[in-house]
Amino acid sequence: MSESNKKRFSLTQRLVLAVVPRIVWALFSIAGRTWRFEVIAEEGVEPCLQGQKSGNYICCFWHQCVLPCTVYFCASHAVILISQSFDGELITRILRLFGYNAVRGSSTRGGREGLLGLKHTLDQGGTAIFTADGPVGPIYRTKMGPVKLAQLSGKPLGAFHLEPEHAWRLNSWDHFLIPKPFTRIVVSWAQWTEVPTDLPDDGFEAKREELNAALERARARAYAHLGKAVE
């Protein structure tokens, strides 16, 4: 562990960071092989399928879907923005074991550095992934970061939701989802959001709302496909 991390985290936190990522990786590497992903999409939308390399765009989803998203996209070579908090460090170490790279930053800390890191990924032809309401909510409310990245890079914003048929739902701000073994997971894609590179300052909020609406349509469609009532 680097000297900077020794200063940032307590002894207990450092022990957690040393042990927990490998346990989580082992458990969900096994459990993830039992999950059955079913992809649906709005008319005219070409989704990114499990096992294929993603395209040159920005994908957005709600923070509660991190675990199923990690398994679904593990072959995509995507780069994800993770906060600089302790929780972010923990998630980063888990994602590295699944083969991801992470850019550190968030809407609350290191945001500019994070956006520039993701822009570099997009400039190199890669895929960027955003937890749209992370790192601390409020739930189901998109932050401005994805829209700013789309405006900087000229790349479109994809909106999707992963809804397990059977899952444990944690009592956290995001109602974090842990899919149960052998469950079906619906991957629901909505229409893309295009953001002009010359978007004026007074146009950002409308684009944020457009992306938020797409994410909520994707979530509602997944719930309906499973016969669930939207929470």
What are these regions (language model features)?
Residues 105, 131, 159-162:
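Generic beta-sheet signal
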Residues 117-153:
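Catalytic-site beta-strand/loop segments enriched in glycine and acidic/polar residues
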Residues 108-112, 139:
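A conditional alpha-helix N-cap/helix-loop micro-motif detector
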Residues 1-76, 92, 209-231:
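Membrane-anchoring hydrophobic helices of lipid-metabolizing enzymes
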Residues 88-92, 113-120:
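Short, charged beta->alpha transition segments
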Residues 56-109, 153, 169:
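Catalytic core of membrane glycerolipid acyltransferases/transacylases, capturing the structured
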Residues 3, 141-201:
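A cross-family acyltransferase "interaction/gating" segment
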